[in-house]
Amino acid sequence: MKISKMDMSPMLNAYPDSVENNIEGMLGFLQKEEAQDIFGSFYILPSIFNTDLDRGFSIIDYNLNEIYATENDLDKLKELGINLKFDFVLNHASVLSKQFQDIIKKGQESEYKDFFINWNKFWEGKGEMTEEGYIQPYPELIQKMFFRKPGLPILMVRMPNGENVPYWNTFYQEVRYDKVQEQDLMQALQLQYLTALEIAKMVNDQLEKGVIPANVELGRFEKYKKQVVEYVESHRKYLGQMDLNIKSPLVWEYYDDTLRTLAEYGAKIVRLDAFAYAPKEPGEKNFLNEPGTWNLLERIQQLADKYELTLLPEIHSSYEEKTYEILSQKGYMAYDFFLPGLIIDAFEEQSGEMLEKWAQEILDKQINVVNMLGCHDGIPLLDLKGLIKDEQIQRLIDTVVGRGGFVKNLHGQKNVYYQVNATYYSALGEDDRKMLISRAVQLFMPGKPQVWYLDLFAGKNDYEAVRRAGAGGHKEINRTNLSMEDIEEALKKDVVMTQLKLLRFRKNFPAFEKMNNIKIQAVG
C-alpha cells in the first residue's frame, strides 16, 4: 500500500543486540515505567535475520537469528502496541544463501543458475574476453557506470567442473582458502605422507602471507604444483553480497516470499535497502536507472500491497538532485536525510532560516518523510548540497570532525565524503541543551520521527569500539552496545528523561496525528 493513514508516532531504531546483546534486552527497557507509551514503532536492523556480514546487510535468509530474537520476542513487542519496521535488501543476497550455494554445488545444473547476474552473460557481445576469463565491457558502455569499489564489480566463482565464472558483485567480497591438511592432501593427490606434510606446510605459510594459490612456490615439489593448486582452488570459500538478477522469475518469487515473511513478523514499514542498484542495463549508470528503478518499485509495491506494507525506499542523494521529491510524487515515503545536518548548521550559523525553508517545502509539496538525528550510519552532510552552500557543508564536516568524528573517503575518492561518523550527541559538542533542542525540533518537524537508541541515551563517540573493529570500523563509533546498568545510569540524567517526556508528548498529543496544518516560523 502506498501511503494512506500513516502511524506518525515515534519509532525506536536499534540493532537487535544494542541492549544486553539481544531483543530481550531492549524489551526490558521498553517495559520500564520510564519508557511506557513512548514508541509506536521499532525499526530493528537486519542482523535480526540470518546474516553473515555488514552488520546484517548481507542476508542469508530472513529467518530470525536465534542468537538475537525469537518470535515470542516479536509477540511481546506487539503486546506493547509497537509495530515493526524491517529491511528488505533488494539488490543482493549473501554468497551463503541457499540459492548461491546451490550454484556453487551444481553449476549450470542448478535451478538458480540465473538467480544472480552472470557477468559474462550480461555483457555478451558488448566487450572483449580477458585472459582471466571475464568480459571487459567496451569503454563507452561503462563510462557512466557507478562503482562502489575499484575495478569491475565481479567475483570469480569456481564451478564444479573447475570453470571460473564471474558474477556481479557490487558490494563486499572475500575469497578464503582453508588450511591444507596433510592427510587430506595425501589421499587426494596420492602422495607419500611426509611429502604431503611438507607441501601442506609450504602452502599454508604462503597462503597466510596473502600469496594466491597460482603463485605458491613448492621448491623441490614443484612437479606437484598443478595438482596442488587445483586441490586448493577446489576448496575455495567465499564471503560477499551477490547481485540478484531481477529479470529472473525466481527472484520475484523470493521477493514475494520475503515480504510475506516480514508482514508475518509484524512489519508495517519495509525499508528498501540498495534498491537503486538492482536495475542494470549496458551503457547505463546502473544506479537509479530510469525508468528501470521506478518500474522495479512499482512491481515491489504490487507485492507489498498484498501484505498491507508501506514501502520506504532508502537512497542518499543530494538535495539538488530532488530524488526525495520524485519519490514523493510517485507516492512513496522518503527519508529526511537533510534534517540532521540542518540542525547542526542552525547552531553553528546561529540561524534557523534553512530549517524553516526545508520544513515549509515538506509541507508545501506534501512530502511524507521519516526523519532522524542519528542512525546506524553516519551523519549525511553531503546530502545538503544544493540546499546550503558548499562552504557551509565543509564547515559542518570540519566541525563534526573537530569534535571527534571520523570521515571515510567515498569509494577511494580523496576528499569526497559520503557521511561523517559520530554520535549525534558528540557532533553537538556533547551539549545537553543542544541535544534537547535538536530532539524538540525533530519532533515538531513534519514526518514520522525515528530515534536512534544511542541518541536517546546521550551516547558519546566510542573510540574503543572503532579500535576493536579495525580497518573500516569507523561506523562503530556510533553503535555502542549497552547493558541494563548503562541504561539505569542514563535514566538518571535530565538529558535522557527530558527526551522521553518530549517523545511521550509527541506520541500522544492529537495534533501530531495529522501535521498538514503546521505553521513554520524561524526566530533568530
Mark where each language-model region is.
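Active-site and adjacent substrate-binding regions of carbohydrate-active enzymes
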Residues: 1-524
